[in-house]
Amino acid sequence: MTYHIDIQNATGKLLPLSEDEITKLASLALRDHKQDAELTVRLVDVEEMTYLNHTYRKKNKPTNVLAFPCSLPANIELECPLLGDVVICPEVLLAESAQFNKSLHAHWSLILIHGVLHLLGYDHIKDEEASIMQMLEAKLLAELGYANPYEVEENELE
């Protein structure tokens, strides 16, 4: 399969992951899609993420990731199907990693995979859908050597 992943760093800051790492993570999430695909990963600051989250979800605060699936008119065909955009706020990921005592790279991996899965049609609104999405995320993270982020460790319960 051929994947075209456009990376846009609108933060103006150096990121903890290279463009190659971001591309590999997005490609991993696309692997079972079994079709050529194109998507954009846009990295934004807190101000832009707050604006997007307020505009599209009516929540006036930043979030870690938003996914915007592409919907083209039926009469338009592209050589490589455009899935849409994954928008990530690195500042939010950094804060969440510290708050939850998680590896920054592991958290980036989870959030990027999560966003790409949304473009593929996965969701977590209903419990059954959430379970399927979380199992797939955990499987992909395990391939990268990361623990299942949805399992609570015993020492976290104390």
Curated annotation (Swiss-Prot):
Q: Which GO terms describe its cellular component?
A: cytoplasm
The cofactor note reads:
Binds 1 zinc ion.
Q: What keyword terms does UniProt attach to this protein?
A: Cytoplasm, Endonuclease, Hydrolase, Metal-binding, Nuclease, Ribosome biogenesis, rRNA processing, Zinc
- Supply the enzyme class, top level: hydrolase
| Residues annotated for Zn(2+) binding in this entry | 114, 118, 124
* Cofactor(s) demanded: Zn(2+)
* EC number assigned by the record: 3.1.-.-
Q: Name one Pfam family in it.
A: YbeY
Extract the coiled-coil ranges from the record: none
Localization per record: Cytoplasm
Reply yes or no: does the keyword rRNA processing apply.
yes
Chief subcellular location: cytoplasm
The GO terms describing molecular function are: metalloendopeptidase activity; RNA endonuclease activity; zinc ion binding
PANTHER family, from UniProt?
ENDORIBONUCLEASE YBEY, CHLOROPLASTIC
Q: Which family does it belong to?
A: Belongs to the endoribonuclease YbeY family.
Q: What does this protein do?
A: Single strand-specific metallo-endoribonuclease involved in late-stage 70S ribosome quality control and in maturation of the 3' terminus of the 16S rRNA.
Protein name in UniProt: Endoribonuclease YbeY
Species this chain originates from: Legionella pneumophila subsp. pneumophila (strain Philadelphia 1 / ATCC 33152 / DSM 7513)
Show the taxonomic lineage.
Bacteria, Pseudomonadati, Pseudomonadota, Gammaproteobacteria, Legionellales
| Gene name, Swiss-Prot/TrEMBL | ybeY
